[in-house]
């Protein structure tokens, strides 16, 4: 099935609280108990079903900035925060007629997104879709208040653990939820609940893993211990190793409280080997409060092999809350939000090779001096699959807009938000260098080109990539990939030259010889002789045949653009794709439910639920 919320109006309407049902967080057990596969639990259930299987990420040290990071020491990162703002009905990541909605996009620096204001066991389907295509796991949160467990949650957990655990796992698998998350800072004397949750978590992890899910992970805030008491900041030991589980009985990953630095001896791999053999210290997440005020421990983290846990706040994402710091219009807020997340996850320079030394800081609001999460981890990629089964296409669409374009043609001028249609976006954001594959600070071009998303135009969707400035010679590394090419594959670059001039070539390299550009002379995208025309999308296609036949059989490891002789360049990039043959057209959808939600002087709001083969 598919789902859609529509707003046909001159000024789009925000998703109203009564337009779509939110499941109740404490009642997951009741939902699972009533669930019959193939039958709807409630009318809006389809809004919480993911249609995209989680993709598995791959490793290639040659296309990492820091080649010393391996599976054993490359930190994971859980972003345990709300999507948007929970006030005014908690629209979260559900489809919406409001452009100024949160379109998170720096997925390559996140391994799990715990949607803090999504219900326990549920995540909006579109949000799960875009996370899954990028190889990121998702979960909702059981937001149990601190202190003695309430009757509501005691009853809810009792119902949940009283159900066959495998049915819960099947429920999560069906809906595309990759684990269970808990704000576990409650106390309880119920061994039935505690032992039942441990058994449930083990079953969920085992079942989803056996179903081929590469991103399954349950998260437990390290407050409630094995005995139902609250013991923060005690490391891993006899008090919580059953909740954590060993390598043969994987149950949860632990999100450590913010004073984790005080028990470093209890967080080493040797400690993990003692209390949970077969697990990794990277399954322990050093907690950081995005609101600030926690101990400044970033330099300490550099010396310990722990993953990163980011929380904050209860009702809104702190990076989202800062988006109005550079202007109050919706376009200014959206543009600055993308700038902020690029700074936070890459670094203040938004270029991972222009590194900033890690220092201690309790304020986690990014700025030009922020060292970024790229100081601790690689940018990960899921861009590896059989092109005969699925083409690789990016229109650089963020999943929201002030208008909607399709193949360069304006469809309407209504605001919209649907993060589920967000495209694959550049991996490193933005790896500019004077040399192809240049990885050190001396390869940073002073006053070089700039890159950012623009909401002024789009080939498909509501945004595209804007590249602008002047430079003699510079490379922009776009995508970390591992696509095996075949004869007759077609590589497409689509652009609009808004102003200025440049020589631009596509620069590709192959796995095993990543430093060598493959026949750059055969990939001319733009020349200084081309005239600017801000009305025309120009398509350049390159077929794996003739002079480019030597690409057949090679696995493309790097996709980059090479700029030379750029003067006042203003270039919109609307598509990069690699396709193999013609993809079949999907069957027309079968409308299941179509209803008007509201009619008002601004237009009509509606909801459509449909089935597709």
Task: Please annotate each region the language model reported.
Residues 8, 494-545:
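Extracellular ligand-binding interfaces
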Residues 14-53, 284-443:
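Substrate-binding cleft of secreted/luminal carbohydrate-active enzymes
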Residues 69-267:
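Chitinase-like catalytic core of GlcNAc-active glycosidases
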Residues 183-361:
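Substrate-binding surface in catalytic domains of secreted glycosidases
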Residues 429, 465, 475-504, 540-544, ...:
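Extra-cytoplasmic beta-strand recognition segments
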Residues 445-475, 530:
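Short carbohydrate-recognition loop motifs
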Residues 493, 537-579:
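Extracellular beta-strand ligand-recognition surfaces/modules
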Residues 601-613:
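Conserved aromatic anchor
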């Amino acid at each position: 099935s598919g789902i859609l919320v529509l707003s046909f109006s001159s000024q789009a309407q925000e998703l109203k609280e009564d337009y779509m049902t939110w499941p109740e967080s404490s009642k997951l057990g009741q939902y699972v108990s009533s669930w019959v596969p193939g039958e709807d639990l409630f009318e809006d259930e389809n809004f919480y079903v993911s249609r995209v299987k989680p993709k598995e990420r791959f490793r290639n040290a040659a296309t990492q900035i820091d080649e010393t990071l391996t599976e054993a020491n490359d930190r994971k990162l859980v972003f345990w925060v709300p999507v948007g703002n929970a006030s005014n009905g908690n629209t979260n990541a559900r489809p919406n007629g409001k452009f100024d909605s949160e379109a998170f996009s720096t997925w390559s620096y996140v391994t799990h997104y715990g949607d803090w204001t999504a219900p326990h066991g549920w995540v909006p389907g579109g949000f799960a879709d875009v996370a899954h295509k990028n190889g990121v796991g998702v979960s909702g949160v059981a937001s149990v208040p601190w202190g003695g467990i309430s009757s509501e949650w005691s009853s809810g957990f009792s119902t949940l653990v009283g159900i066959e655990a495998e049915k819960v796992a099947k429920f999560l698998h069906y809906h595309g939820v990759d684990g269970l998350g808990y704000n576990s800072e409650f106390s309880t004397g119920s061994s039935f609940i505690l032992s039942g949750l441990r058994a449930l978590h083990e079953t969920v992890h085992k079942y989803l893993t056996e179903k081929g899910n590469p991103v399954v992970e349950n998260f437990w805030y390290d407050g409630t211990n094995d005995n139902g008491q609250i013991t923060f900041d005690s490391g891993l030991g006899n008090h919580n190793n059953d909740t954590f589980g060993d390598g043969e009985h994987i149950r949860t990953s632990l999100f450590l409280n913010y004073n984790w630095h005080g028990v470093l001896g209890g967080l080493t791999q040797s400690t993990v080997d003692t209390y949970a053999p077969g697990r990794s210290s990277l399954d322990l997440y050093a907690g950081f409060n995005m609101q600030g005020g926690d101990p400044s421990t970033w330099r300490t983290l550099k010396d310990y092999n722990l993953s990163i846990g980011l929380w904050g706040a209860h009702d809104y994402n702190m990076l989202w809350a800062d988006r109005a710091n550079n202007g109050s219009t919706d376009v200014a807020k959206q543009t600055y939000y993308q700038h902020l997340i690029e700074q936070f996850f890459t670094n203040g320079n938004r270029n991972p090779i222009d590194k900033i030394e890690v220092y201690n800081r309790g304020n986690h609001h990014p700025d030009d001096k922020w060292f970024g999460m790229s100081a601790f981890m690689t940018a990960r990629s899921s861009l590896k699959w059989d092109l005969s089964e699925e083409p690789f296409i990016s229109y650089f669409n963020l999943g929201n807009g002030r208008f909607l374009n399709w193949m360069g043609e304006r469809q309407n001028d209504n605001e919209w938000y649907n993060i589920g249609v967000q495209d694959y976006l550049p991996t490193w954001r933005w790896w500019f260098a004077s040399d192809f594959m240049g990885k050190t600070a001396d390869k940073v071009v002073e006053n070089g080109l700039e890159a950012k998303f623009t909401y002024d135009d789009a080939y498909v969707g509501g945004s595209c990539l804007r590249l602008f400035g002047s430079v003699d010679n510079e490379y922009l590394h776009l995508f970390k990939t591992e696509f095996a090419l075949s004869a007759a594959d077609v590589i497409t670059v689509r652009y609009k030259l808004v102003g200025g001039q440049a020589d631009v070539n596509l620069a590709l390299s192959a796995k095993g010889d990543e430093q060598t550009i493959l026949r750059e002379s055969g990939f001319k995208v733009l020349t200084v002789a081309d005239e600017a025309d801000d009305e025309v999308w120009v398509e350049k296609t390159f077929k794996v045949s003739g002079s480019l036949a030597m690409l057949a059989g090679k696995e493309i490891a790097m996709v980059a653009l090479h700029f030379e002789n750029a003067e006042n360049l203003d270039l919109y990039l609307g598509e990069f794709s690699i396709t193999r043959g013609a993809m079949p057209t999907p069957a027309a959808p079968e409308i299941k439910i179509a209803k008007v939600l509201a009619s008002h002087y601004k237009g009509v709001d509606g909801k459509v639920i449909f089935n597709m083969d």
